[in-house]
């Protein structure tokens, strides 16, 4: 209680004025009375805290009574963590009703006033896991007989966010339990799958493939709910969480010999950045990266306290799991490290660990108080609130850990025949190993060491030429020519950055179709081949010099070679579709390919003849051209679905999605800085393409100058910078860009309604599809 004494003495010094030589007796008595009151308040605080420590008993023997809020008068004499937080959403818990084992006696315990919302979030997460992923056995997360973990660890969470924050933490617990019971390779796979889910939102421009597993479905649902509350703060949490799972991948089970080696690793593994994201999102805080970096030296002992306390209370649970499922000869736990480092038994190691927890807790309180005195007014209030909230996290975690079944009740030894049941709690994708994926690649194919393009064929020809100059002319069994040259342009365009929207769409739709994995991969490959072919041909036909920030394929390989390669991809796509062993699938492939070319022909015709189409003509062209591949995907998946006669009709949704995708592209072409970097500024104007904004402008208010510029573009091959500015001025005058964005909003709303309808029709929620739509929202 040294801190309380100091603060009281300081307060007394501030209240009592310097006594002048002639001071009235009344004033002197009043000052003495003030000192007496302050001393009485301090003494009461000291007795309450001392009583708490002296009466400490093991938590499992303590009474499980409800949280007992104390009066405002009582609260005023108990030391608060900092002046940065004025409690709004929590009650102070009477220290005589719980036991902190003397680990953090300087810190108060608060519990959220709406703790039932935290319980609701934890239970909802467990139900979603059972429904989307698999059975849950011997699991306990945030819930406990006394306190919910989040309700005491983040007691000042904004009430509207408490349920989803607890849901997120429960999901993290479920994921963590998988890691505790699998080997390193499978653990890395689980973490990589989780990281891909976050990466698909954080870095949509990267080629990130999100799994279609049940766990990814649940992750997508969680991400959508977080983004809907506050997108910027949610993105910080997702970035922090991504950093955690990426850091965990490949880092399990190090053979640490000393605690000072282990603790920095454990702090990261515990989720220092993750907890930063949880607190800031929960409390609605915005902290700049620079400020967060400055605070690291302050918060290090806080996270060391949390890490050590977690290891202390979870020792029995982790040791049982270690003995039942040994994935290493070593444990990653502070108790284990201390026993090795100091050659002591378990009880002595626990005492040492307790001392370390107290020391690090006291050090954080000291650093925090000093920082607050020196930095107030120099740093943001949100940073100070975050540092104060960490004190609540420490006391909340210590007390909750003593009551939670997660650490105090342990599952029995697993029977051998129950191994497959444990696997049921993970996604189907979790059984895939790195070896499975590499078997299907061409990396292992050995190529000749020569540099010639016709290497193997030339070697044979040269050897025969040495024997005879006539022989090859009569030889009708010459080696087959390699496809290296014809595929090179297509491999180039395939290597360019891509958002893989079509892949994500296929994975999302398969929530409803359940197409077997092998056939699903065939459909993906066929669609990829068609898409890459159309990209190469489109860039030639539009005379576009850039594709995703790189030179277009025909700029690198020439027009003739690019056309030939694109045509070859059509043949490969047809061959791939044949592997589906379905005449109906071939008919779908041919029909949609014909429609795609009809749509493209009209787009080219309008541009070449500077003929503005009507809105209806434009939309039908989009349905044929852009929507064609989405229609093909849905129809092929419906034909290969094992749910014959029960597959949903997605024609409305795929048509709307194709329109949304194309019109979004029209809008981004004129408005997006990212699009400018990848394709050039207002490239559609250079190409003379009749996009929706241009069609709206010309039909709303016909303009001779704009039409003249389009004709001059046809002559010159592109528009100058100044001409583009003039064109944009006319679009602004007719509010065509505002109209386009408004139409995108209407379509987005209708797409969400289509998803609602299909979810009701199929009885299956589709969070992957909802997340994809969210990523594409303008």
UniProtKB/Swiss-Prot annotation:
Residue sites binding Mg(2+) 3 per the record: 538, 542
Binding site for Mg(2+) 2: 176, 180
Functional description taken from the UniProt entry: Bifunctional sesterterpene synthase that possesses both prenyl transferase and terpene cyclase activity, converting isopentenyl diphosphate and dimethylallyl diphosphate into geranylfarnesyl diphosphate (GFPP) and further converting GFPP into preasperterpenoid A.
Residues binding isopentenyl diphosphate, per UniProt: 499, 502, 531, 548
TM stretches of this protein: none
Similarity comment: In the N-terminal section; belongs to the terpene synthase family. In the C-terminal section; belongs to the FPP/GGPP synthase family.
Composition skew (Basic and acidic residues), residue ranges: 414-431
Region (Terpene cyclase): 1-414
Record-listed Mg(2+) 1 binding positions: 176, 180
Keyword Lyase: yes
Binding site residues for substrate: 176, 266-269, 310, 314-318, 406-407
Cofactor: Mg(2+)
Pathway(s) per entry: Secondary metabolite biosynthesis; terpenoid biosynthesis
Residue numbers binding dimethylallyl diphosphate: 547, 625-626, 662, 669, 679, 689
Gene name of the record: PvPS
Region described as Prenyltransferase: spans on this chain: 415-778
Gene Ontology terms: biological process: alcohol biosynthetic process; mycotoxin biosynthetic process; terpenoid biosynthetic process
Location of region: Disordered: 416-454
PROSITE patterns listed in its UniProt record: POLYPRENYL_SYNTHASE_1 (PS00723), POLYPRENYL_SYNTHASE_2 (PS00444)
Keyword annotations of the record: Isoprene biosynthesis, Lyase, Magnesium, Metal-binding, Multifunctional enzyme, Repeat, Transferase
Domain notes: The conserved DDXXD motifs as well as the NSE/DTE motif are important for the catalytic activity, presumably through binding to Mg(2+).
Organism domain of life: Eukaryota
Name used for this protein in its record: Preasperterpenoid A synthase PvPS
Swiss-Prot/TrEMBL catalytic activity: isopentenyl diphosphate + (2E,6E)-farnesyl diphosphate = (2E,6E,10E)-geranylgeranyl diphosphate + diphosphate; isopentenyl diphosphate + (2E,6E,10E)-geranylgeranyl diphosphate = (2E,6E,10E,14E)-geranylfarnesyl diphosphate + diphosphate; (2E,6E,10E,14E)-geranylfarnesyl diphosphate = preasperterpenoid A + diphosphate
Residue sites binding Mg(2+) 4 per the record: 538, 542
A GO term, aspect molecular function: prenyltransferase activity
Short sequence motif DDXXD 1: positions: 176-180
């Amino acid at each position: 209680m040294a801190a309380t004494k100091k603060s009281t003495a300081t307060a007394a010094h501030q209240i009592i004025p310097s006594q002048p030589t002639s001071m009235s007796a009344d004033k002197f008595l009043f000052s003495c009375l003030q000192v007496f009151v302050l001393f009485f308040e301090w003494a009461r605080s000291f007795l309450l805290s001392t009583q708490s420590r002296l009466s400490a008993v093991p938590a499992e023997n303590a009474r499980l009574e409800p949280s007992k809020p104390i009066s405002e008068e009582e609260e005023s004499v108990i030391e608060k963590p900092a002046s940065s937080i004025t409690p709004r959403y929590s009650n102070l818990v009477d220290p005589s009703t719980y036991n902190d084992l003397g680990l953090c006696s300087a810190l108060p315990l608060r519990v959220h006033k709406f703790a039932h919302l935290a319980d609701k979030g934890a239970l909802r997460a467990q139900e979603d896991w059972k429904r989307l992923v698999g059975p849950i056995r011997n699991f306990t997360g945030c819930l406990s007989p006394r306190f919910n973990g989040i309700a005491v660890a983040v007691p000042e969470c904004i009430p509207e966010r408490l349920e989803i924050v607890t849901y997120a933490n429960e999901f993290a617990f479920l994921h963590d339990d998988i890691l505790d019971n699998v080997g390193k390779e499978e653990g890395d796979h689980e973490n990589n799958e989780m990281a891909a889910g976050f990466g698909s939102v954080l870095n949509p421009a990267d080629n990130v493939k999100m799994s279609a597993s049940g766990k990814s479905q649940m992750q997508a649902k969680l991400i959508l709910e977080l983004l809907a509350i506050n997108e910027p703060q949610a993105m910080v949490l997702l970035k922090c969480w991504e950093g955690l799972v990426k850091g965990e991948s490949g880092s399990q089970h190090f053979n640490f010999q000393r605690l000072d080696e282990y603790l920095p690793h454990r702090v990261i593994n515990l989720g220092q950045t993750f907890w930063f994201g949880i607190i800031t999102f929960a409390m609605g805080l915005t902290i700049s990266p620079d400020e967060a970096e400055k605070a690291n030296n302050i918060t290090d002992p806080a996270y060391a306290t949390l890490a050590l306390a977690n290891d202390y209370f979870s020792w029995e649970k982790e040791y049982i799991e270690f003995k039942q499922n040994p994935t290493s000869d070593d444990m990653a736990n502070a108790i284990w490290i201390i026993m090795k480092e100091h050659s002591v038994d378990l009880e002595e190691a626990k005492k040492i660990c307790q001392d370390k927890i107290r020391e690090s807790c006291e050090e954080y309180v000291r650093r925090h108080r000093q920082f607050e005195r020196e930095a107030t007014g120099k740093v943001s209030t949100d940073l100070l609130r975050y540092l104060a909230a960490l004190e609540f996290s420490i006391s909340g975690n210590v007390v909750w850990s003593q009551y939670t079944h997660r650490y105090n009740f342990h599952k029995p030894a697993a029977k051998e025949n129950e191994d497959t049941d444990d696997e049921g709690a993970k996604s189907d994708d979790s059984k895939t190993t790195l070896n499975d994926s590499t078997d299907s690649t061409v990396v292992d194919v050995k190529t000749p060491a020569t540099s010639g393009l016709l290497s193997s064929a030339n070697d044979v020809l040269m050897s025969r030429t040495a024997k005879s100059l006539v022989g090859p002319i009569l030889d009708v069994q010459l080696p087959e020519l390699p496809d290296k040259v014809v595929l090179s342009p297509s491999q180039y365009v395939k290597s360019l950055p891509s958002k893989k929207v079509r892949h994500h769409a296929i994975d999302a739709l398969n929530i409803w179709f359940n197409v077997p994995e092998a056939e699903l991969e065939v459909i993906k490959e066929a669609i990829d081949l068609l898409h890459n072919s159309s990209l190469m041909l489109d860039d030639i036909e539009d005379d576009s010099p850039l594709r995703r920030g790189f030179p277009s394929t025909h700029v690198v390989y020439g027009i003739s070679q690019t056309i030939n390669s694109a045509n070859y991809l059509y043949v490969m796509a047809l061959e791939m579709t044949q592997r589906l062993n379905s005449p109906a699938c071939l008919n779908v492939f041919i029909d949609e390919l014909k429609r795609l070319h009809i749509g493209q022909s009209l787009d080219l015709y309008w541009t070449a003849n500077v003929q503005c189409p009507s809105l209806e003509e434009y939309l039908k062209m989009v349905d044929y051209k852009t929507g064609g591949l989405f229609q093909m995907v849905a129809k092929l998946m419906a034909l290969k679905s094992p749910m014959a006669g029960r597959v949903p009709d997605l024609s409305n949704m795929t048509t709307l999605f194709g329109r949304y995708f194309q019109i979004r592209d029209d809008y981004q072409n004129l408005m997006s800085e990212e699009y400018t970097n990848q394709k050039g500024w207002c490239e559609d104007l250079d190409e003379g393409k009749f996009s929706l904004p241009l069609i709206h402008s010309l039909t709303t208010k016909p303009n001779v100058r704009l039409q003249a510029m389009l004709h001059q573009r046809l002559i010159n091959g592109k528009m100058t910078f100044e001409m583009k500015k003039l064109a944009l001025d006319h679009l602004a005058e007719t509010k065509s860009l505002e109209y386009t964005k408004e139409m995108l909003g209407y379509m987005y709303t209708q797409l969400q309604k289509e998803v609602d309808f299909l979810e009701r029709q199929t009885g299956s929620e589709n969070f992957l599809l909802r997340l994809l739509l969210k990523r594409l929202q303008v």
